[in-house]
Amino acid sequence: MARRLLLSFLLPLLLLASPALRAAGLSVGLAADVSSLDPHYLNAAPNIAVASHFFETLVAVDKDGQLVPGLAQSWQAINPTTWEFKLRPGVKFHDGSPLTAEDVAFSLDRPASLTQSPGPFTGFTRAISGKKVVDAHTLRLTTAQPYGPLPLDLASIFIVSKKAAAQATTEDFNSGKALVGTGPFRLVKFRRGEAVELARFDGYWGEKPAWDTLTLRILPADAARLAALLAGQVDMIEGVPGTDVARLKKDARFRL
């Protein structure tokens, strides 16, 4: 996975210490806290950004805002109220089990079950009135009336393992017990309010990440985040303080 894609969740202003390009591991200072690793619990940008390293969606959105294949290699409206999605073959979860249409159907149902969510994802699944698993790699979704934006909505719902998450709570995701996705990284450890530690998933179906490990340090204070970069404690930060941009542009150690 290219560096730009891997870190696409970060804000436009980035500083990267040059040696990090050659390192086996990358450490990033985040500007916002991550409240949960449950991908269906809270519809908030910091949580979604981190979840995107572990989980993927049926449909993706490219840098130009166009819909492109994700876990679904194709989709089509077979009548005004029915959409058919064909899953990408050969995709594995972090536990080695294959991705199936049953996992997708379960994942689309799950947001509605999280009744205590402070920011639910149900707005992206509300239009779906029915689901039919045709075979292991084919899922049909029906809507009560014609609904063209459905593929775009599905770009916001992460797919989880039904086996791992069927009886799981949000805390089971935070502990790592239920955190089984298809993404390029797997969870090593979540230290709430401090850091998220990740390791490359070698069974990933797509382009492999450039680094073996990724550490996301939670550093909401601008001064602390910048100090960590200058001290070599992190390789990259998001949210570079505007007052420091001009000075840092002149520092050959970093790229802005």
Where are these regions (language model features)?
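Aromatic- and charge-enriched surface segment that lines or borders ligand/interaction sites
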Residues: 74-117, 140, 225-228
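N-terminal lobe/hinge region of extracytoplasmic solute-binding protein
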Residues: 29-79, 109, 178-181
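Alpha-to-beta junction loops
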Residues: 26, 104, 137-139, 146, ...
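Gly/Pro-rich hinge or "lid" segments in bacterial periplasmic/extracellular proteins
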Residues: 66, 155-209, 213, 223, ...
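Short, well-ordered beta-strand elements
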Residues: 24-33, 73, 82-85, 104-108, ...
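Surface-exposed binding/hinge segments that line
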Residues: 76, 122-165
